[in-house]
A protein has these predicted regions:
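N-terminal start-of-chain detector that recognizes signal peptides
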Residues: 1, 51-54, 80-84, 152-153
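Short, well-ordered coil/turn elements that cap or connect secondary structure elements
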Residues: 22-24, 74-76, 104, 172-174
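PAPS-dependent sulfotransferase catalytic domain
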Residues: 84-202
């Protein structure tokens, strides 16, 4: 079975992209998001005291990946994969790229990104305030009054995200990479690009029941402009 990974900055569409692939009949993917730390910087040492043999370290990353991502695999499975998103710590992007470059030379990489960085930051703040991070978590219907973003915190996250994306885009030099846009692909339903990238058959995404929960950014971000 072949491997893929979905990664990108937080609130850039990693989850809906993950769900679009996870439901495909030829894909087996771990349901939840994988923590960057400890897996991507420690590998097998996540479970040991670190006294691993060289061959264990070399094969440990792949063994863990294959083990957790193939739980739902069957005779139709062609790809196994996972998703992880970047937030808070700029070193996290380096953990991901280093692991992929060293241990996963043939993995397919899907990078999500968002052009509207104000909306991206506002989405993160709104999710934290409401506790509702995804549109398929319908148990929490709390509404949020319009919010005002802290421009200094926004600038910090913007700079962090630029660093994240610069590091991730280095993978274009070593891997087969698809950049998947929130505005141009996700919002327009262009999920066929994911299937084309992995060379798997196209299916109508009847398993994708996500609906937009938040109003448009201009409606709930007071200082959007």
């Amino acid at each position: 079975m072949k491997r893929y990974i979905i990664t990108g900055c937080s609130r850039s569409g990693t989850s809906v992209t993950h769900n679009a692939l996870k439901g495909h009949p030829n894909v087996s993917a771990l349901n939840d998001e994988v923590l960057i730390e400890p897996y991507f910087n420690m590998g097998l040492s996540t479970f040991t005291h670190g006294r691993n043999l060289k061959i264990e370290n070399e094969k440990g990353f792949q063994a863990i990946f294959d083990g957790i991502c193939s739980i739902g695999a069957n005779e139709d499975t062609e790809y196994i994969g996972l998703k992880t998103s970047l937030y808070y710590y700029p070193i996290y992007a380096k953990y991901v790229t280093s692991a992929l470059e060293k241990y996963f030379p043939n993995i397919k990489v899907i990078i999500t990104y968002r052009k509207d960085t104000v909306a991206q930051y506002g989405s993160w703040i709104r999710a934290r305030k409401t506790g509702q991070y995804h549109s398929w978590n319908k148990k929490d219907k709390k509404l949020l009054h319009p919010i005002k973003l802290n421009k200094y915190q926004y600038i910090k996250q913007l700079l962090d995200n630029l660093d994240f994306m610069e590091e991730l885009r280095n993978l274009n030099l070593t891997h087969d990479v698809l950049e998947f846009s929130y505005e141009d692909d996700i919002c327009k339903g262009n999920f066929y690009k994911l299937f084309d990238f992995l060379k798997i058959p196209y299916y109508e995404l009847d398993w994708l029941n996500s609906k937009k929960v938040a109003p448009s950014p201009k409606k709930y971000i007071k200082n959007y402009n």
